[in-house]
Amino acid sequence: APYKDLPVKLLKLVLLTHEHSDHIKGLGVFLRKYQVPVYATEGTINCILNNKTVGKVDSDLFNVIKPDRDFSIKDIELLPLHISHDAADPVCYRFFEKEKSCAVVTDLGEYDDKLVSSLQNLDAVLIESNHDVNMLQTGSYPYSLKQRIWGNKGHLSNEACGRLLNRLLSDRLKHILLGHLSEENNYPELAYQAVRNEINFSPDKYQADNLDIRVASRVKPSCLVEF
């Protein structure tokens, strides 16, 4: 059966990137029902438990991980990587299994050479393409929120996403999923085209037509990507 039809009870653990509500909403209900282990940084865990943002949960379910230190869960090796975001101790994740590797990279206002180096030689990536700059500038958000979003601890614009991808592209990286799109300040078509333009206009040899670039839905599971 397609993975989107699999029952929730088959989920064996939870990985958290940070404590913002759009990333932990529903966590308390899920843990009270299924009691699976949760992996997150110490700062993230402390925010969740001390602020009781998820309600009453068993603190023993939480496992502390450290940025830039890998750990294993069964046959999968995971590497949490520090990111620049306005949260307590945020990370993105890189996954390794046998000869394959992928990453989930969202919620970052900027990136540095260390992060770029840590994300080389991927086979697939889900990467943030949060907003269209013009839509954000002219939209209804308060100016303070706009500053937060386009700040260095905010979110990557469509063009910034494309520029980061240009530094990650290799002969291995074929599958790109654009994610964490703003509902108010972006459209899937805008994100898709902006990222393609950044890739195609780069002096590097890679062209968007040779890549599997898709946009993740905000409301339903994306299609299965195999690599």
Residue positions per predicted region:
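Short, well-ordered alpha-helix to beta-strand connector turns
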Residues: 11, 59, 122-123
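Cap/insert and terminal regions of metallo-dependent hydrolase folds
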Residues: 113-215
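Short, basic/aromatic-enriched C-terminal tail that caps enzymatic domains
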Residues: 211-227
